Amino acid sequence: MLDPKLLRNSLDEVAARLKTKRYDLDVDAFSQLEERRKSVQVRTEELQSERNSKSKNIGMMIKQGQDPQPLKDEVAKIGEQLETAKAELQDIQDKLDDLLQGIPNLPDASVPEGASEDDNVEVRQWGSVREFDFEPKDHVDLGESLGLLDFNSGAKLAGSRFVVMRRELARLHRALAQFMLDIHTTEHGYQETMTPFLVHAHALQGTGQLPKFEADLFKVPGEHDFYLIPTAEVPVTNLVREEILDAKELPLKMTSHTPCFRSEAGSYGRDVRGMIRQHQFEKVELIHVVAPEQSDAALEELTGNAERILQLLNLPYRVVALCGGDLGFSAAKTYDIEVWLPAQKKYREISSCSNCRDFQARRMQARWRNPETGKPELVHTLNGSGLAIGRTLIAVLENYQQADGSILVPDVLEPYMGGVKVIKSAN
């Protein structure tokens, strides 16, 4: 959530910056609510002061032997007016809060201008794209020909955008998750964290998925207000909700391997083939909670940590800076990491690394105690995939495929595969 003071003091400037994110702020609606809020707040304070003053006079009248009843009646009437004003003020504040909850984060000054992903700016590339002496297959043809990737069974169990993995491929998927966690915890200093896969609505509000993106979520019917998590960003970041962290606890770096559940409501017709866009997938998430002055460096570090996984797997990739029009709701700045997929002959997103500044922290009231002031201040939060496991599996299948349809196991994964070096058809 944006700082309400910033909106009050620089409304036109904020509106102009939000336009670069393809968001039109309703300036008139905010201004009208804010004027009403100020007017009713002044009225409330005046009534409170008047009631307090007259209440004191009641005691004086009693001491002087005067009849206080007329003044008591007047105080009671003022009290009724005060309660009405307080209720009106709360109603206005609720409307302002609802409006604020729907306003996205402001883009950093360093974010490239642009309207869509076509305007994103490449920052760097790593690795050499492999030259095949045969026509490379996509992951669907490879997995199905090996008898290890089964979309028909996934559809039988749950419908479209689900898959069943078998034998060596299921093990390779598990190996990737373990490998990522091992690197992030032993080399990069993250705390491994296990959280619930179900959360209440307030957790999703804290990280910005609610109220704007409810259609993208799976809600569990019943007496509990539960949603399936769309990313581990939600439960892990919310661990600092309504907390005041000590300065020595920062930076706080956490990693978590979870399933993720998304309805893909806005993705009809996109990536319908294969595992690129699934309703259920797994991901290793990276979370940083930092002091404000640490967040610029933290974004570079987090992105580098995600890149390290691809480097160790020897998968070519590039990093792009998202333009304003392609930024997510809560992000102030984002780097996407895109891995090379030979069958598509292009780079595809495998990680999105974002600095949310104090946007999520304000929604969650996540703070740290600044030793210089001794006062609680909002932290900055960052998140990124380190990596999406299904998409990493796709990249391994396509980049390590052989002419006979077999798949070489990357060297770094062999210890997790029980010495299996090549994945072949069982037939």
UniProtKB/Swiss-Prot annotation:
Gene3D superfamilies: Bira Bifunctional Protein, Domain 2, Serine-tRNA synthetase, tRNA binding domain. It catalyses: tRNA(Ser) + L-serine + ATP = L-seryl-tRNA(Ser) + AMP + diphosphate + H(+); tRNA(Sec) + L-serine + ATP = L-seryl-tRNA(Sec) + AMP + diphosphate + H(+). GO terms for molecular function: ATP binding; serine-tRNA ligase activity. This is Serine--tRNA ligase. Its main location: cytoplasm. PANTHER family: SERINE--TRNA LIGASE (PTHR43697:SF1), SERYL-TRNA SYNTHETASE (PTHR43697). InterPro entries: aa-tRNA-synt_IIb, aa-tRNA-synth_II, aa-tRNA-synth_II/BPL/LPL, Ser-tRNA-ligase_type_1, Ser-tRNA-synth_1_N, SerRS_1_N_sf, SerRS_core, tRNA-bd_arm.
